[in-house]
């Protein structure tokens, strides 16, 4: 692990995957009698949990009501907010088609799709902000702009991730947000501020995000612990 980290410069999560694969190969060789001992029998590698970056409710509201100067910034903000309120990754946003939008008899809209990264199916209901953005881009006049590809057959006119990243920096400054906005933060914001902090169980969040394993969603466990701590603090304040 030290070699992979300090010599090869791999990230903790990558090291964890590499070691898991190596342990599997060595264990099979040992079980097949090709090795006298399994050197990895009692070896475990625990990767450091990455720090999760997400927006608070206050920052989300600043983003919604803030004024931006350019049309492309307005579109990029819409795309970012849609991801905040659905948990979609940038890749899944770009490939979202109308066939993946389902409306129930009571008028609610749902996204039923498959994650591009993991090929895992996921379903998520459109909250009012996401629904309003969807309706905005169903109007043909809002779909066409020389800075955004037409993206035929898709729901949104999505620009490149690099171009959107540059826009997000300007948007943050104009909306009074000090954090360095990146599109992966939108997905984290959905998981934390909009889901876990509103009492949605971790297992349900995992399904909405399209995670292949529930363990992947454990990166948000620290936020869950923070929620518990805040709840206990409120009880202590009430009791006096």
Regions found by a protein language model. Name each.
Residues 116-136, 144-170:
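C-terminal catalytic core of Y-nucleophile DNA break-rejoin enzymes
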Residues 47, 54, 115-119, 209-234:
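Catalytic-site neighborhood detector that most strongly recognizes the C-terminal catalytic loop/helix
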Residues 81, 85, 91-92, 170, ...:
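C-terminal catalytic core of tyrosine-transesterase DNA break-rejoin enzymes
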Residues 100-107, 178-179, 199-219, 230:
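Short, polar N-cap/turn motifs at the start of nucleic acid-interacting alpha helices
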Residues 66, 122-125, 132, 136, ...:
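DNA/chromatin major-groove-contacting recognition/catalytic segments
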Residues 1-28:
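Short, Lys/Arg-enriched alpha-helical recognition elements, typified by the DNA-recognition helix
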Residues 44-53, 57-59, 95-136:
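Conserved tyrosine-mediated DNA breakage-rejoining catalytic core shared by Y-recombinases
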Residues 10-18, 31-90, 94, 198:
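Basic, Lys/Arg- and aromatic-enriched nucleic-acid-binding interface segment
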């Amino acid at each position: 692990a030290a070699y992979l980290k300090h010599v090869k410069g791999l990230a903790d999560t990558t090291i964890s995957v590499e070691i898991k694969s190596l342990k599997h190969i060595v264990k099979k060789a040992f079980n097949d009698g090709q090795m006298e001992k399994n050197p990895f029998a009692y070896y475990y590698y625990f990767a450091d949990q990455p720090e999760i970056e997400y927006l608070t409710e206050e920052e989300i509201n600043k983003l919604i009501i803030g004024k931006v100067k350019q049309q492309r910034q307005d579109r990029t903000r819409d795309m970012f907010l849609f991801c905040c309120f659905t948990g979609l990754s940038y890749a899944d946003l770009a490939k979202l088609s109308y066939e993946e939008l389902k409306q129930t008899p009571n008028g609610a809209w749902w996204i039923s799709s498959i994650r591009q990264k993991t090929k895992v199916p996921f379903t998520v209901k459109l909250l009012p902000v996401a629904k309003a953005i969807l309706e905005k881009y169903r109007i043909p006049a809002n779909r066409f702009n020389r800075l955004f590809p037409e993206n035929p057959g898709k729901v949104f006119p999505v620009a490149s991730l690099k171009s959107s990243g540059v826009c997000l920096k300007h948007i943050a400054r104009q909306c009074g947000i000090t954090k360095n906005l990146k599109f992966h933060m939108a997905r984290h914001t959905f998981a934390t501020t909009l889901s876990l902090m509103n009492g949605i169980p971790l297992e349900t969040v995992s399904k909405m995000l399209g995670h292949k394993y529930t363990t992947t969603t454990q990166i948000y466990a620290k936020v869950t612990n923070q929620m518990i701590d805040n709840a206990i603090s409120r009880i202590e304040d009430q009791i006096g």
